[in-house]
Amino acid sequence: MSEFATPRAVFQRLIDGVTSRRPDGLPQLYAEDAVVVHPFARPASRLEGRDALREHFAQLETLPVEMAARNVVVHQTADPEVIVAEFEYAGRNTETGRDFVVPNVFVMRVRDGRIVESRDYAHHQAFEEAMA
């Protein structure tokens, strides 16, 4: 048995940390030189390295949201390092009471128990509208 967490387990830790809004441990899920791209963000964004990810995840603590991940489906691929995860963040803006559902598809490569690259296809506009 491998001493490293599986891609599926690492993904689960990621969405658990995001939905609980506990950002402190999230950067440690990533390799030092990890690259995360958000192709559907306006403008598209690219985060390189743990420091950039730490800054990105720190925003979770200030967001006025309660949310959960639902309809989670993780697909294994022919490459044992790569998974495709489909899911939704569903929640509520605690300041406005506005409900939201944000569909996501993450294509994630996990090597030695850490995310080395991820393409996160999220409906950023739906989240931005919920925060307005």
Predicted regions and their residues:
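A solvent-exposed, acidic/Ser-Thr-rich amphipathic alpha-helical stretch
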Residues: 4, 25-78
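A short hydrophobic beta-strand element
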Residues: 79-89
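Low-complexity, intrinsically disordered terminal/linker segments enriched in charged
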Residues: 117-132
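Short, surface-exposed coil-to-beta transition loops
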Residues: 68-69, 100-105
